[in-house]
Amino acid sequence: MKYKLLVLDLDGTLTNKQKKITPHTKETLLKIQEQGVKIALASGRPTYGIAPLAEQLELQKYEGYILAYNGGEIIDWKTKELMYKNLLDHDVLPYLYECAKKNDFAIVTYDGEYVLTEKPDDEYVLKEALLNVMKIKKVDNFLDAVKHPIAKCLIVGEPTRLAELEKEMYEHLKDRMGVFRSEPYFLELVPKGIDKAQSLAVLLKEIGLTREEMIAIGDGFNDLSMIQYAGLGIAMANAQEVVKENADFITLSNEEDGVAYAAEKFILS
């Protein structure tokens, strides 16, 4: 099978522990793009947090794509055209806010290059801002500040307590929206039906490819749907067990250029 689209998760997959793309991985990914294979970067990060990696991989030159907010937005990185967008229902924001507040957790969302929150000094808010190379904007009242359309909210906090809140919120919201953790300390709150596989189906239709022509590589629970959906689903060696169990192939870890290894094996060889 000649694969024409390579879909990559970022954290724990494309990037190493330092959140960097290694020179070998970059060189390999430029090589496959020169051969005509398109790359899509699919992440829970906001668009602003994915952009620097898209620039490093020259996605503009090679006509690649970004799936931000776990697939809530799809952007053609050459033209910067927004191909697809699914927004959070503002009616649900008061409930999300109350859940965070009663547990003394921070809740955040995004506005351009800013992470918006009432708790700018929270250690997990700082993690999210650092991860995405975004500035933190302190707001006095989250609900008053968020009047613009948003693709997701994030509640952040100590993992054990956050796991309990996740169960409670999932039961309350499962018919209305997606509730899941992308990291033990990050609880993602997104529009219902938003996952990487669903958004990739939209992208494939737009660009005239089939899922059999797609490789997807990831490590986390939010990568599971796209790994199951892709013609070739690949888990990183450092992936969660459930992801490995559902993958067609397990590559090396993100500390061992696992993405480059898979691209060399299935695209360049």
What name fits each language-model region?
Residues K2-Q18:
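Asp-based phosphoryl-transfer active-site loop
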Residues P23-E123:
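Active-site phosphate-binding/coordination module
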Residues I32, S43, N70, C153, ...:
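Residue-level signal for inorganic ion chemistry
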Residues C99-I217:
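Conserved acidic, metal-coordinating active-site core of Asp-based
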